[in-house]
Each structure stands twice: as structure tokens, then as C-alpha cells.
Amino acid sequence: LVDRRPGEFEGIRLSLLAGDGLLSGMRVFGNPPHTRAFLLFDGETRAMVALMDYGMLNSLRVGATAGVAAKYLAPAGAKTLGLLGSGWQAPPQVFAMVRAVPTLERIKVYSRTPANREAFAKQMATALEMPVEAVGSAQEAIEGADVVDLCAPGHHDVHEPLFERPWIQPGALVVSMSANQSTADFVRNTRVVAASYENIVSEPDAKPPFDELVAKGEFRPEHVTRIGDVITKGANPRQQDSDTVLYHLEGGTVQDLYVATWGYEWAKARGLGKPFDLSL
């Protein structure tokens, strides 16, 4: 369960998360911007058991989710990954996708700052032991790619498409971190996969271009294949190999709890972290 209406007071935003395990969690967003933490609680005693950096936790969760999407939705024999963005979210997504799709042979990356994309390409080429090329435009990164990862976070309140539909190769998988990165024309001509239809249109309101499509009756629940059905029931969003798939990455907030639980158990088993006591 996730409280999708974060509490806000004095510049602080809180989101509560509870799963089916023995732990519950809370995301805390404060000021200055990007001051973010994750609090993990014992499900029975309600005592806090861990305080974590949410930025790192979030990048691991998003990366793992992108990898799962690539494993189940990438076209057969995918060889090229086209990446837009080289920031802190990019490395976990690239590592996860390369592991999930072992046929990948090369990566093309574009980001707005040449020095950043060059440094990222060098770092990833060394870490992955595969060709990683920094290119000069988004179009160059995307064209010919079997898997496209829109890893530039953008601004959630601004519609800023990162690509044009003709750039996308038929049959490709496009992984998007935010709804507002796509055009209405692209969404109309693709197979959409997400956690659920509601995750796309209710955060708290549908973002462009989905708001326009919903208003026109061109985007309805039957247009979305649930990623859970793909994984557990073998649902295939493609009707033919040339169908392009858009995986909408938002809406996996409850996954933070499970990644935090894994991280807590992993660190505790290795004697890592700094113990603290909040009792009076």
C-alpha cells in the first residue's frame, strides 16, 4: 500500500509505504532540494531500524525496474542500446539492462553536456568491457537502437518530448522515466506497458501527452498491458514483431520498500552501516 498523497509541511514531503513483509517505510523529501532520506521501520514494534540515502536507493530501484522491463520486453536478439542521459540514474539502468539482455553488444549515449557524455561513455566502456560511444545528438543515439532508454529525468510539470517517432526503429523497446517524454503521435502508435493504467493517468493528474489522449478517448485501460501480467502470465503486448513497446517506468514507489529491505538485510549481514539508538 502506498499513500499517494504525500504529507507536506514546512518544506518537507512524506510518503508512507507498507508491503506484505515485516517492514514498513517512509520517504522524506526536504529542503534544500534533493535532500532525501528513506526510513525503514519494524512492522511489529514500529521502531525505526534504518535510515538510508534515498537518492542511491531510488537509482537502484529504478535501474532494477528498467532491467526487468528490458528482460521481458526487448526484441529478440537486441544488439544496440540507445541512451539519453548520463546522470546519476543512468549507470544502474545500464548495468541492469546489459545483464538482463545478454545479446546487447554496444551502447550509444547522448546528453546535453559533451564532457559528461564522454566521461560516462569511458566509464561504462571500462566497467562493461563493451563499446560505449558518446554521440552528438539524441537522434543519433536513438536511430537503429533495439532498446531506447530515456534516462533524462526532465521536469514533471513540463511537456518536453525527447525524441520524434520516426527515430524509433520498428519493434524497439522504449523505456521512459516520465510520461511527458513522449509525443501523442508516438503513444498512439505503440504498445504501452506499465504497472497499471492508473499509474499513468493518476499521479495525481495525467501528464502530457496522456492528458490529451485521455480527454479525446484515445487512451483507455485496455491500451495498457500490466508489467505484472507480462512477468507472471506471459502476456505479450506485441501483436507482431514490428510493434514498438513503450514501458512507462513511473508508479513503482512501493518497490522502494523492497529494495530498502534488501539493502538493510544485505548491509546487516556484512556488518556495514553505523548503528544508532533513538531510545530515550
For the regions a language model picked out, list residue spans one by one:
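Short helix-loop-beta connector
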Residues: 73-80, 103-104, 169-170
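NAD(P)-binding Rossmann-fold cofactor-contacting core
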Residues: 100-125
